[in-house]
């Protein structure tokens, strides 16, 4: 449906089951042009060591015509918006996603969750907030969407939230999509794949977007060029190899 997927996990996050090579093969099969590997930040119990992220610099940029972005799904750690990505990790990464995960930041009341998420958005360190519609972490959706639009941060619609994880996310995600639409911000679609078989599956995301008449021109996944322009506007250096995507 879209040629870009921005959220997936490899065997480096040990509750996932596919390798980088598996994802490349599946991307070729499905016509995915660009994807981001976003294993969990090191504060999660089964996450890779921070060296894993630093060493992503050895990855090729293109394999058989498929572009690979070096990313992380970092953890929001506290109400100050600190994340478990720092120092040399930033130097090796193209894409920083951050979100709430219970082993790192336990669910709080709506005010506290909102404060932590807005602080993360405003930090300038994050490109995308993952699964902001998680019902375990209620937030002030309009305030989050307005902050994200102001700071040029995308809010994710996460396909896995409607299938395997975060049950009860539908109403919240419709509210997120509508609030982003009204604020003039961006959404990012993520399969949140933990196995390569679901790479590029945005079927449930599309239902959410259609329900609120979300504009296609505010979806980052529409083309590699749109996503790369967004990242470059946030400071990522152009990647010459991606010019052919």
Curated annotation (Swiss-Prot):
What Gene Ontology terms describe what this protein does at the molecular function level?
A: phosphatase activity; phosphoric ester hydrolase activity; zinc ion binding
The protein's required cofactor(s) are namely:
Zn(2+)
**One GO term of the biological process aspect:** bacterial-type flagellum-dependent swarming motility
Residue positions annotated to bind Zn(2+) 1 are 7, 9, 73, 192
Which Gene Ontology cellular-component terms appear in the entry? cytosol
List the CDD domains hit by this protein, alphabetically.
PHP_HisPPase_Ycdx_like
Q: Binding positions for Zn(2+) 2?
A: 15, 40, 194
Keyword Protein transport applies: no
EC number(s)?
Answer: 3.1.3.-
Q: Family, per the entry?
A: Belongs to the PHP family.
Record text on subunit structure and interactions:
Homotrimer.
Q: Please state what the protein is called.
A: Probable phosphatase YcdX
Source species: Salmonella typhimurium (strain LT2 / SGSC1412 / ATCC 700720)
Query: What is the name of the gene encoding this protein?
Result: ycdX
């Amino acid at each position: 449906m879209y040629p870009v997927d921005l959220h997936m996990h490899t065997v480096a996050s040990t509750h996932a089951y596919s390798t980088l090579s598996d994802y490349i093969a599946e991307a070729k099969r499905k016509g995915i042009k660009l994807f981001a590997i976003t294993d969990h930040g090191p504060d999660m119990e089964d996450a890779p060591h921070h060296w894993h992220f630093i060493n992503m610099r050895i990855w090729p940029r293109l394999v058989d015509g498929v572009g690979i972005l070096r990313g992380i799904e970092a953890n929001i750690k506290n109400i100050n918006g600190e994340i478990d990505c720092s120092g040399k990790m930033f130097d090796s990464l193209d894409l920083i996603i951050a979100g709430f995960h219970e082993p790192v930041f336990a669910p709080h009341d709506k005010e506290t969750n909102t404060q932590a998420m807005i602080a993360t958005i405003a930090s300038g360190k994050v490109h995308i907030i993952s699964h902001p519609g998680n019902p375990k972490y209620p937030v002030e959706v309009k305030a989050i969407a307005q902050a994200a639009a102001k700071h040029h941060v995308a809010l994710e619609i996460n396909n896995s939230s409607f299938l395997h994880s975060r049950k009860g996310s539908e109403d919240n995600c419709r509210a997120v999509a509508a609030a982003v639409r009204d604020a003039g911000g961006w959404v990012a679609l993520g399969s949140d794949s933990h196995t390569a078989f679901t790479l590029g599956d945005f079927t449930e995301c599309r239902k959410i977007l259609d329900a609120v008449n979300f504009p296609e021109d505010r979806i980052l996944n529409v083309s590699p060029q749109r996503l790369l322009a967004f990242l470059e506007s946030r400071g990522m250096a152009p990647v010459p190899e991606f010019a052919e995507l």
